[in-house]
């Protein structure tokens, strides 16, 4: 009985037609003469839109970060994933940013365009970037800052360009801005419109170093805590230069041509803690240091200071309400250390914090 059943099963298998496994594109390999019957439909290709965003050719995409740096690109790639939050295009050969280059990138938070050849940015190029917080344009060929930057912007870095003008209109309504970097540009004082930075209520950090400005920009916002103007051609600090900077904590004026600091200048920055005036042309210690309550670090090395008075740094009858100095540099000045009275540094925290000598 069992043998009979097995024979019947084998007979059914031998009578059955050959099994054909059809793949997705097998219809392309069939005999063209057979065609498609009236009741048959060709297999449908998958909808590419259902597969999600596609990474631009040669770029790398991971966790909403699109990296297209160092690829020799001469324009912004097309069809960038709309969920991109960081786009890195640095070290390419892009010459122009056009309207539509960043369309649909409403979630972009950071845009890196450093070290390209950008000389032109269309007025509406950044309009779609409603959430952009960081814009890096350094090492390009821009002559002016772009118009209509996103109001959400918090950090702008555009050093090492060819910028000669900073218009007030560029920063109009930029109430979220915190950091601005404009160093190493052929910028002159006349090129900075008066009050260009004034309306930005959260602005905390400005760096305009290694340019051709001869004065401290006017109309700086009171929110500023750090101002770096090193390596310029500033000749003097007027009584009004720091007016209104009540929150300024760090002031960098190294490597300028400053020969005088007007009395009362430092009083306009009552919370100043660190002052860099090294590598200038000062002939005396700036007035007002002894009366300054919070200042702790003063760099005055490489100047022409020949005399240091007993009360230049500390008030008479030093009281503990003034913060102690943690650093005072006077080396590479004509004044000899033995000519300075020991009591001059009575409000310095440690003697090792005082740097003298080495003048040639």
UniProtKB/Swiss-Prot annotation:
Q: How is it modified after translation?
A: The attached glycosaminoglycan chain can be either chondroitin sulfate or dermatan sulfate depending upon the tissue of origin.
**Would the keyword Ribonucleoprotein turn up in this protein's UniProt record?**
no
Q: Which residues form the propeptide?
A: 17-30
Q: Which GO terms describe its cellular component?
A: extracellular space
- Glycan-bearing residues: 34, 212, 263, 304
In this chain the LRR repeats are located at 74-94, 95-118, 119-142, 143-163, 164-187, 188-213, 214-234, 235-258, 259-282, 283-305, 306-335, 336-360
Q: Which residues form the signal peptide?
A: 1-16
Q: Name one Pfam family in it.
A: LRR_8
What domain of life is recorded for the organism? Answer: Eukaryota
Localization per record: Secreted, Extracellular space, Extracellular matrix; Secreted
| One GO biological process term | negative regulation of vascular endothelial growth factor signaling pathway
Assembly and partners are described as: Binds to type I and type II collagen, fibronectin and TGF-beta. Forms a ternary complex with MFAP2 and ELN. Interacts with DPT.
For this chain, the family text in UniProt reads: Belongs to the small leucine-rich proteoglycan (SLRP) family. SLRP class I subfamily.
- Entry protein name: Decorin
Organism this protein belongs to: Oryctolagus cuniculus
The gene is: DCN
């Amino acid at each position: 009985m069992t043998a009979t059943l097995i024979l019947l099963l084998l007979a059914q298998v031998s009578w059955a037609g050959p099994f054909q496994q059809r793949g997705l594109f097998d219809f392309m390999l069939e005999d063209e003469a057979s065609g498609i019957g009236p009741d048959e439909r060709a297999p449908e290709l998958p909808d590419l839109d259902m597969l999600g965003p596609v990474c631009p050719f040669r770029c790398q995409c991971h966790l909403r970060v699109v990296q297209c740096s160092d690829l020799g690109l001469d324009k912004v790639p097309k069809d960038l994933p709309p969920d991109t939050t960081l786009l890195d295009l640095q070290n390419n050969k892009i010459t122009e940013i056009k309207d539509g280059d960043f369309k649909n990138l409403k979630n972009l938070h950071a845009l890196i365009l450093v070290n390209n050849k950008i000389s032109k940015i269309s007025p509406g190029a950044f309009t779609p970037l409603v959430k952009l917080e960081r814009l890096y344009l350094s090492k390009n060929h821009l002559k002016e800052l772009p118009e209509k930057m996103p109001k959400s912007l918090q950090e702008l870095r555009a050093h090492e360009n060819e910028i000669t003008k900073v218009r007030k209109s560029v920063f109009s309504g930029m109430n979220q801005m915190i950091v601005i970097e404009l160093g190493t540009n052929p910028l002159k004082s006349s090129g900075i419109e008066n009050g260009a930075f004034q309306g930005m209520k959260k602005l905390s950090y400005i760096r305009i170093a290694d340019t051709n400005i001869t004065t401290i920009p006017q109309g700086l916002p009171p929110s500023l805590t750090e101002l770096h103007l090193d390596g310029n051609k500033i000749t003097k600090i007027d009584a009004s230069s720091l007016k209104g900077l009540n929150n300024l904590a760090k002031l960098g004026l190294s490597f300028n041509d400053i020969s005088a600091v007007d009395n009362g200048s430092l009083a306009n920055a009552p919370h100043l803690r660190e002052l860099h005036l090294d590598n200038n042309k000062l002939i005396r210690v700036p007035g007002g240091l002894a009366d300054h309550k919070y200042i702790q670090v003063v760099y005055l090395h490489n100047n022409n200071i020949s005399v240091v008075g007993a009360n230049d740094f500390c008030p008479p009858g030093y009281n503990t309400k003034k913060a102690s100095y943690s650093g005072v540099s006077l080396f590479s000045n004509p004044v000899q250390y033995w000519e300075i009275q020991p009591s001059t540094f009575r409000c310095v925290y440690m003697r090792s914090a005082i740097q003298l000598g080495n003048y040639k």
